[in-house]
Amino acid sequence: MKIFREVFELGNKEIILETGGMARQADGSVTVSCGNNIVLVTTVVKKSVADGTDFFPLSVHYLEKTYAAGKIPGGFLRREGRPSEEQILISRLIDRSIRPSFPDGFFNEIQIVATVLSYDGAFSPDILALIGASASLAISGAPYDDVVAGVRVGYTNGKYILNPNKQDLRDSDLDLVVSGTDDAILMVESEANSLPESVMLGGILYAHKHLKTIINSINRLAKVASKPRMEYSIYQINKFLKSQIKSQFFGEIKNAYTIASKQERNLKLNAIRKNVLEYIFSSDVDGNEYTEKEILEAFHDIEKDLVRSNILEGKPRIDGRCTETIRPINVKIGVLPGVHGSALFTRGETQALVVTTLGSDRDAQLVESLDGIEKCRYMLHYNFPPYSVGECGMVGMAPKRREIGHANLAKRATQAVFPNEEAYPYVVRVVSEILESNGSSSMATVCGSSLSMMDAGVPIAEPVAGIAMGLIKDGAKYAVLSDILGDEDHLGDMDFKVAGTRYGVTALQMDIKIKGISREILEQALEQARVGRLHILGIMNEVIKEHKEAVSDVAPQIHVMNINPAKIKDVVGRGGATVKGIVEKTGAQIDTSDSGEVKVFAKDKKSMDMAVAMIEEIVAEVEEGQVYKGKIVKLLDSGVFVNLLGSQDGYLPFSEIEQAGMKTNSLVEGQGLEVLVQNIDRGGRVKLSLVAR
């Protein structure tokens, strides 16, 4: 067994790449170690293309094993189940980073599995998994020429931090992951605290500068441990077939792409496709027999060339806009009367109905990870039904990876403005229903989430808007597009989503289909996005620019009380009897903590006020010199104990009763008396006198 090893430093941390010791039957197998973190990443490449495959079937699976953190999984089976949302998001991050590095037309299936074997809690293993995926590909024999690496960057007190640990990130205004090759940036994922575009750009360039060390180390490992380059074929469009279709139908295709409406344009294009198929099948074009798939792919290539060349030549985009114009926007709030908050955000042919629901602590999501169980107070879910694009499909299934990814992006974009628990004790769930989609549905979700939460009375710090930027690039010529359509995303070279407030960026997500982009393009895209974002915020602010002061009449009420911690036992009562009685009488939900915090959550204000009043009565402190109406709770030889407030009793001597002209032999338990608190000694004992009738 021959083991090869490479060691390099990243942010003053030693990282070790090793191959030859584990999973040797995989085409590529690398362990990546940093401290006590170890991730095993394997790559398997199919040696032939499956019949009918017309895409690149790359799949990435990031898996966390609970034994890595010395834990046993929860649940009845006590074993790992389906991957968590966080694991799916990391799988997507790796996929998006490495996918652009494969040649166009390479359709062999590749499966990458990254397994966390050991975890120390200091660092997230995601960057190690990304580095390991690139390294395992580099030694697998797959056509992976442009080696990719990735790093995480933080930003604290005006300084960038390379490879920050989890504690660093808690204090950081930025959580940025950048991946790329030696000379190009391929993928960006970030969450930020309303940082200026200049800081975001600086972070991206700072990250890219540090990729070279990792790439060099991977290349050295591949030089000594790589398998021979596999034999493979590249699928190519038949140029003669393409020219024949173009000569006969280009005018019709060109006219179709002047139709602004997506539905009308698609109807026209479908009719042209039908005519193209009939023409090719009924004529002997070049003596060859072509499949429907080959014909439609050639047709699609003509569409792609047309749209791209029009934009690069300065002609109007598909819907008639110039490169910087934003589609018409319509904003409505409070569209659903029975919910706590709602907004309908429409931008061109993309529409999101976003609904906010308020809940109590008990509604918080409990998320299990290698770090333990975390309580999530803010949830955002994104649904993309097939009717949103005029199609039939599966409905009511578990969310797909894309839906999970879009929800996470929208949540990250709005997380920076979401109030902390001390300022706002509600748990919040936001759901985005995409009703129509023609590009930028995730950014419509960002805008709709901001509007919906403000409608629900959630005190977000600032409204947030998002915009998707695109890129068409051919050699040195390029055009950056604001607010891209679905076709521009599909036919273009970049999908760059930017979200933020009027002050700065809260989230970035960039995916590149070409071999990377330059600083100049990034700068232009960020500036164009800033202008577009401010335009969108201006329209949103005309409808609502700050949160409503009160929650909806149909929303639950919540009240937080801070009482003397010693009084918590009085609120709870023996065996919980007191608090159960309050809950039964009022219908409220009551949560207490040893710190003295009491949360009252009720379906309406009446129930809440009743519960609060009952608790206040229990915890109220008796004061000297005050008169109280109490009841006798115990008779003694020398006096009586009178209950004043809650569990607080006072002692009333017979001498005080007789002095007030009342006979002591007539007293009974449960009898009401009006008494004055004479004094309270250091031990908390209360002495009473009877108020004369």
UniProtKB/Swiss-Prot annotation:
It catalyses: RNA(n+1) + phosphate = RNA(n) + a ribonucleoside 5'-diphosphate. Its EC number is 2.7.7.8. It is found in: Cytoplasm. Residues 625-693 form the S1 motif domain. GO terms for cellular component: cytosol. It holds the Pfam family PNPase. GO terms for molecular function: 3'-5'-RNA exonuclease activity; magnesium ion binding; polyribonucleotide nucleotidyltransferase activity; RNA binding. Its cofactor is Mg(2+). One of its GO terms (biological process) is RNA processing. Residues 556-615 form the KH domain. Belongs to the polyribonucleotide nucleotidyltransferase family. Involved in mRNA degradation. Catalyzes the phosphorolysis of single-stranded polyribonucleotides processively in the 3'- to 5'-direction. HAMAP family: PNPase (MF_01595). This is Polyribonucleotide nucleotidyltransferase. It comes from Francisella tularensis subsp. mediasiatica (strain FSC147).
